[in-house]
Amino acid sequence: MTDIFNITHSEEVFSSALKLMPGGVSSPVRAFKSVGGQPIVFDRVKGPFAWDVDGNRYIDYIGSWGPAICGHAHPEVITALQEAIEKGTSFGAPCVQENKLAEMVIDAVPSVEMVRFVNSGTEACMAVLRLMRAFTGRDKVIKFDGCYHGHADMFLVKAGSGVATLGLPDSPGVPRTTTANTLTAPYNDLEAVKKLFSENPDAISGVILEPIVGNAGFITPEPGFLEGLRELTTENGSLLVFDEVMTGFRISYGGAQEKFGVTPDLTTLGKVIGGGLPVGAYGGRKEIMSMVAPSGPVYQAGTLSGNPLAMTAGIKTLELLKQEGTYEKMGLATSRLIEGIMQSAENNGIAINGGSVSAMFGFFLCEGPVRNFEEAKTNNSELFGKLHREMIKRGVYLAPSPFEAGFTSLAHSEEEIDRTIEAFDQSFSVIKN
């Protein structure tokens, strides 16, 4: 590995970007605010690798923030897109590809009997919130501290992702009246949820959560937590919603609900199902989804929803994922990676705890365990920033925030895992003092 990179061109491009876009980026975390150093400007990606505009190559553990589960620019996905684009980029009308991808999602995800495609995970969560309220006739919703469900006003309360990265409790411009119906509880705390139901009888439309928190680092559900939420929502006539934008088709073909054996009423999806193109979806029981326009009165629409390119990329990606041994392969690679990272930290006297589920992983530089967002905030963010900068020098691209999960793909081989662990060994050795 090269010990240091020349990133002069990245510096020049980003300097220009600062004059053109707020913070120089189209999404806040990309600005490296929580890790320091120069944001890297990418030129191209392929397989497990990304190349910046200076020609430096990185082993990529962001994967476009989750969609690139088959590896970047998979040849079969590219070929399918090349064929599709010859027929046009968007129809603004029904297309065959919508039917095919819908069938695949319904076949895979236990809770989904009908599905509606949108253009982002945020859109999916906005729409599912409206649907929850309409179906139950109730206004309040419970979310969990550190869980991120997009940047809609109702969800910007104790949120994760970029909100956590920047240390914001909420966002200016969100009226208190908008968030008055958003109730929050610590993740993995069933008693707190029970208390909210007790204090708000017949008023809570549902509970929405990331079944594995990936936007406050990487936090897994304690045994019985998801099952307890299922029981509580059923008992109180409320809906359970899994935000599987991140976990859907990543930790298993049927997502977290298949992995943990807990079936919600509604599910939101994104990332993987678009194969790298903008996409989102929400689905669930027929009796609930039938309320969505034009079948029912709950309005939701989108100019590019269900466009043939995103549908095509999604179809090919799911076909690749359905092949035998896919998740076992990714799971073994990811387990070896996180075990190597933790061993390397321990060898250098650095406190760490972490874990992985299939092709998703994360770690905190603190004493563990981490079960919720408050505990996640004990992470040594300053040390993580130093680690991130050292890893960049050694050609490994981690999420530029301690509050984001990492992702592997089918393209990450033993060689990439070994080189990554070597880079961690070197980086931990540098930052420990």
Curated annotation (Swiss-Prot):
What InterPro entries does this protein map onto? 4pyrrol_synth_GluAld_NH2Trfase, Aminotrans_3, Aminotrans_3_PPA_site, PyrdxlP-dep_Trfase, PyrdxlP-dep_Trfase_major, PyrdxlP-dep_Trfase_small
One short Pfam name that applies is Aminotran_3
Gene3D superfamilies attached here? Aspartate Aminotransferase, domain 1, Type I PLP-dependent aspartate aminotransferase-like (Major domain)
What PROSITE patterns does the annotation carry? AA_TRANSFER_CLASS_3 (PS00600)
**Broad class of where this protein is predominantly found:** cytoplasm
Entry's EC annotation: 5.4.3.8
Q: Where in the cell is it found?
A: Cytoplasm
User: What does the UniProt keyword field contain?
Assistant: Chlorophyll biosynthesis, Cytoplasm, Isomerase, Porphyrin biosynthesis, Pyridoxal phosphate
CC cofactor: pyridoxal 5'-phosphate
Query: Which pathway does the UniProt entry assign to this protein?
Result: Porphyrin-containing compound metabolism; protoporphyrin-IX biosynthesis; 5-aminolevulinate from L-glutamyl-tRNA(Glu): step 2/2; Porphyrin-containing compound metabolism; chlorophyll biosynthesis
List the GO cellular component terms: cytoplasm
Q: Name one GO biological process term.
A: chlorophyll biosynthetic process
Residue(s) carrying N6-(pyridoxal phosphate)lysine:
K271
The record lists the catalysed reaction(s) as:
(S)-4-amino-5-oxopentanoate = 5-aminolevulinate
The molecular function GO annotations come to: glutamate-1-semialdehyde 2,1-aminomutase activity; pyridoxal phosphate binding; transaminase activity
Q: Can you state the subunit structure given in the record?
A: Homodimer.
Family of the protein in this entry = Belongs to the class-III pyridoxal-phosphate-dependent aminotransferase family. HemL subfamily.
This protein is called Glutamate-1-semialdehyde 2,1-aminomutase
Q: Which organism is it from?
A: Prochlorococcus marinus (strain MIT 9515)
